[in-house]
């Protein structure tokens, strides 16, 4: 960027602000090293940091510079590069400012609140002289929100003020000039449009002092797309908690690339009808509280124009601001490697204008409240056809958002859909060296290949992940959203006993997986026939936990929430009969009901099942046999093997008991190394069991299969498979149905690589899903974190006090910054936004939640007792008289039942996968384009 001027003060040419200008490829700042994994950014060659410089655009000099202000033609480009010296208007690069100038180069009686001076050796707005690059701290951000405040010890206020009329006497909505560099980056063909060019030259700020339900046109609130009479077809929502600027940029840049894919459609009969395609798409960012927000993320948003420092208001005449709403239409984007992308031509790689709504909530009130702002506040005004939900950090792949939308366009009864989420594996898949990442990668892949297609075939996908899903807005209106928002604690006083304060601990856990509640309510909506689907063409990439503590904490919420929500859907299945689904769909819903019941039962008894499987295999292989089938104990002989197996059993039990102790008394982050040791011990035991299982398979097939599996008649075949005459049939069926299906389905899905690099890790760690993750989850059933957290940052913000204007109008006095100051402050903002990212782990406060422990204890006792009872009943000699069978016979029968049941459930998943694959292929040929 550069100042466009005549070359000096009073040059006779008027100021028109900054112009986007690229770095000279031979300058000292052009050799920027990209973080690993970003070297192949498809638009990096067009970024601010990698192109040659262009000439000043003297034609566009305006008429806004006061004669007393110097007009400079120096380049700001170098100052945007990391480690660049500070520059201020009216001075050369690296020169010290006048003692009578503040950090923006504007004369005043005191230094501004922007942190360090230009001669301090680090950039404006705060910086670390040791690191040499800018960063944003909480204190510096708070200071920048009070640009008109006098410093300690006195001084004069800097800016003049203007009077802004409140809408209906209570709603504060103000337009602010954007920095000249942002305005000039918009392609002229959009800026020159009459009637709508204001969206490119001014950012709109609204201080919402109401509940999301009261954010209505009747109460004086409005949004730009509706003000311009635009139809919103697609509302893309990004929910944010505390992610860093790299994660947010990854999502934001991916969304803008996907919007470009939609705008570039040449043969579309829909998107190109009735106006430009970009006017039918709105991107909404909802940030869950100022306190948790990474302030460097706000610098990134300010760099592309959808946020400005110094405009937010703590309250409007005593009415507390609940949400700060910014609106702007931009063509700028920042990549995850902190490169600024701007339009250069009308080519297919140029980003189109994107309509942004940025909602910065004043307090942290959870994701479900963010969705209430999205659906009840913005959704009711914009009335979109489809809403796509993304979490900050999820990167949609090319044309993924288009793929989700096409699913709704081609199926009028589709109420919700989700795409394929896969783990981010790093450059060259290097993250797969971490066993936890590999296990989660396999889990995601199998879910996308077997589970989601099966549920899609039924018509009810039990969970559309909030990180990457979509809903038809009119489908979720009414009861689905009403039930969904019962979990919002900000409605607790209004809802009374129906709200979160009136819920028992079971229902509170259910709302930990609130997306499952919305899915069930949508399918069971009275009188309607909405169904849910999985769309293979839509893919999203997300980070997964890489440490044991983070992994356990994440799964605690997932497991408890999904367990409670699954029970909720089973108990309320009768509401399906009030829906409008046809008899065929209802038949498949009943099949899915039975399938889900079986899954819940197996999940409940999984702790005992894993223990029994481990001990049975050890006894079958390790104990010596006498008589006709005499054999020695393997692998260490008759004496050592039984003793070795007994020690392993005691270690197994000891570490299971240890998990209960850890879960009841410690947080995962406080016992990190103990949990890592537990993962290692269980994986070693599982590896030993896999070796013994392989030995069993070899022994079973030493007798020719033809002698064990008879095919003379159907009865003989069934007896040889399901009878007790031989083991080969059972083992063969188990191998094919459990493990063979994984390979077959993965190859048919044309995505088999996880079977080679992730499946071995999963085989080693699969017991930890029960012995560690589920034990921790059930022991922390009481841990439900609700409540609004106050914000010190919010308290430090300025207020908007109303006065009476002409004709008794209610007005607010607001500062009126000169364009030069806006542009100068923008320089520091961009420098902070494009600085290299340092990933520093932030310490978290201890969680002292101690309620609902009695319920938790009863649940754990019931679960542990029932599993122990099953294990004892199967293996103990004391039950021989009751069952008239020896414990070995009962053990063999249980083991056989377990294998057949697991194989049966796997076959059901495979059949659903085949149906989905066939339907997708057929629909691909006949779908409307």
Swiss-Prot record:
Signal peptide segment: none
Lineage top rank: taxon: Eukaryota
Any one GO MF annotation of this record: chitin synthase activity
Disruption outcome: Does not affect vegetative growth. Tends to produce fluffy colonies and is slightly reduced in the melanization of aerial hyphae. Slightly reduces conidiation and tends to form pear-shaped, single-celled conidia. Does not significantly changes in the chitin content in vegetative hyphae, but increases the chitin content by approximately 30% in conidia.
Keyword set includes Ribosomal protein: no
Membrane topology, from the record: Multi-pass membrane protein
Sugar-modified residues: 560, 801
Biased composition (Polar residues): 21-33, 140-149
A Pfam match: Chitin_synth_1N
Keywords: Cell membrane, Cell wall biogenesis/degradation, Glycoprotein, Glycosyltransferase, Membrane, Transferase, Transmembrane, Transmembrane helix, Virulence
EC code: 2.4.1.16
GO terms under cellular component: cell septum; plasma membrane
Gly residues: compositionally biased ranges: 1-12
Recorded family membership: Belongs to the chitin synthase family. Class III subfamily.
Entry protein name: Chitin synthase 1
């Amino acid at each position: 960027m550069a100042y466009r001027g005549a070359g000096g003060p009073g040059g006779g040419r008027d100021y028109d602000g900054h112009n986007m200008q690229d770095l000279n490829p031979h300058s000292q700042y052009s050799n920027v090293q990209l973080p690993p994994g970003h070297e192949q950014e498809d638009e990096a060659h067009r970024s601010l940091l990698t192109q040659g410089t262009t000439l000043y655009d003297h034609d566009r000099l305006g008429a806004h510079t006061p004669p007393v202000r110097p007009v400079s033609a120096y380049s700001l480009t170098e100052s945007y590069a990391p480690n660049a010296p500070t520059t201020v208007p009216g001075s050369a690069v690296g020169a010290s400012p006048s003692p009578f100038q503040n950090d923006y180069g504007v004369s005043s009686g005191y230094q501004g609140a922007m942190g360090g001076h230009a001669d301090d050796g680090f950039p404006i707005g705060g910086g670390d002289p040791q690191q040499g690059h800018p960063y944003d701290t909480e204190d510096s951000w708070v200071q920048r929100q009070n640009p008109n405040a006098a410093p300690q010890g006195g001084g004069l206020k800097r800016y003049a003020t203007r009077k802004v009329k409140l809408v209906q006497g209570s709603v504060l909505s103000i337009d602010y000039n954007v920095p000249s560099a942002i305005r000039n980056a918009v392609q002229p063909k959009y800026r020159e449009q009459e009637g709508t060019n204001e969206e490119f030259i001014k950012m709109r700020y609204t201080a919402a002092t109401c509940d999301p339900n009261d954010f209505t046109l009747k109460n004086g609130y409005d949004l730009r797309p509706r003000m311009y009479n635009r139809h919103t077809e697609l509302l893309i929502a990004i929910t944010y908690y505390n992610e860093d600027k790299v994660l947010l940029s990854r999502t934001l840049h991916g969304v803008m690339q996907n919007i470009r894919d939609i705008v570039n459609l040449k043969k579309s009969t829909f998107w190109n009808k009735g106006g430009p395609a970009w006017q039918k798409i709105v991107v909404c960012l909802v940030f869950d509280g100022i306190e948790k927000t990474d302030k460097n993320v706000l610098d990134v948003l300010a760099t592309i124009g959808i946020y400005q420092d110094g405009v937010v208001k703590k309250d409007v005449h005593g009415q507390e601001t609940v949400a700060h709403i910014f609106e702007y239409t931009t063509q700028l984007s920042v990549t995850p490697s902190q490169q600024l992308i701007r339009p250069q031509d009308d080519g297919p790689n140029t980003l189109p204008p994107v309509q942004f709504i940025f909602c910065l909530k004043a307090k942290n009130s959870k994701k479900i409240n963010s969705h209430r702002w999205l659906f009840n506040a913005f959704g009711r005004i914009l009335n979109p056809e489809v809403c796509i939900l993304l979490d900050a950090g999820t990167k949609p792949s090319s044309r993924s958002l288009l793929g989700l939308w096409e699913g709704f366009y081609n199926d009028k009864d589709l109420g919700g859909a989700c795409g394929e989420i896969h783990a981010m594996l790093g450059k060259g898949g290097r993250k797969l060296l971490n066993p936890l990442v590999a296990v989660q990668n396999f889990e995601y892949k199998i879910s996308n290949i077997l589970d989601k297609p099966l549920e899609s075939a039924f018509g009810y996908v039990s969970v559309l992940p909030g990180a990457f899903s979509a809903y038809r807005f009119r489908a979720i209106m009414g009861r689905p959203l009403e039930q969904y928002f019962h979990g919002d604690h900000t409605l607790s006083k209004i809802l009374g006993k129906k709200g979160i304060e009136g819920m028992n601990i079971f229902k509170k856990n259910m709302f930990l997986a609130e997306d499952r509640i919305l899915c069930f309510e949508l399918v069971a909506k009275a009188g309607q026939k909405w169904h849910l689907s999985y769309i293979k063409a839509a893919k999203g990439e997300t980070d997964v936990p890489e440490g044991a503590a983070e992994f356990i904490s994440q799964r605690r919420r997932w497991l408890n929430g999904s367990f409670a929500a699954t029970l909720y859907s089973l108990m309320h299945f009768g509401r399906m009969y009030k829906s409008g689904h046809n008899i065929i769909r209802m038949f498949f819903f009943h099949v899915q009901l039975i399938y889900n019941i079986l899954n819940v039962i197996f999940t409940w008894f999984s702790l005992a099942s894993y223990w029994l499987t481990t001990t049975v295999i050890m006894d079958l292989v390790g104990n010596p046999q006498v008589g006709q089938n005499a054999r020695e104990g393997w692998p260490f002989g008759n004496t050592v093997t039984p003793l070795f197996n007994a020690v392993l059993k005691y270690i197994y039990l000891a570490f299971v008991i240890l998990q209960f102790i850890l879960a009841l008394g410690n947080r995962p982050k406080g016992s990190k190394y103990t949990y890592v040791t537990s993962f290692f011990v269980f994986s070693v035991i599982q590896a030993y069991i896999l070796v013994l299982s392989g030995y069993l398979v070899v022994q079973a097939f030493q007798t020719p299969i033809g002698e064990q599996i008879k095919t003379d008649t159907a009865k003989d075949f069934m007896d040889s498979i399901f009878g007790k005459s031989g083991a080969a049939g059972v083992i063969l069926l188990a191998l094919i149905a459990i493990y063979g299906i994984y390979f077959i389905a993965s190859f048919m899905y044309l995505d088999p690589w996880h079977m080679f690099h992730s499946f071995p890790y999963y085989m080693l760690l699969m017991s930890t899903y029960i012995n560690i993750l589920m034990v921790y989850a059930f022991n922390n059933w009481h841990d439900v974190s609700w409540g609004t957290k106050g914000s010190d940052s919010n308290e430090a913000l300025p207020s908007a006090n109303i006065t009476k204007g002409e004709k008794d109008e209610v007005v607010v006095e607001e500062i009126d910054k000169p364009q030069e100051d806006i542009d100068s402050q923008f320089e520091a903002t961009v420098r902070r936004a494009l600085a290299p990212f340092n990933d520093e782990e932030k310490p978290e406060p201890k969680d002292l939640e101690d309620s609902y422990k009695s319920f938790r204890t009863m649940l754990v006792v019931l679960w542990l007792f029932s599993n122990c009872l099953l294990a004892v009943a199967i293996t103990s000699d004391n039950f021989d008289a009751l069952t008239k069978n020896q414990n070995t016979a009962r053990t063999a029968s249980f083991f056989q039942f377990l294998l057949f049941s697991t194989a049966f459930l796997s076959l059901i998943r495979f059949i659903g996968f085949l149906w989905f694959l066939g339907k997708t292929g057929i629909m691909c040929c006949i779908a409307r384009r």
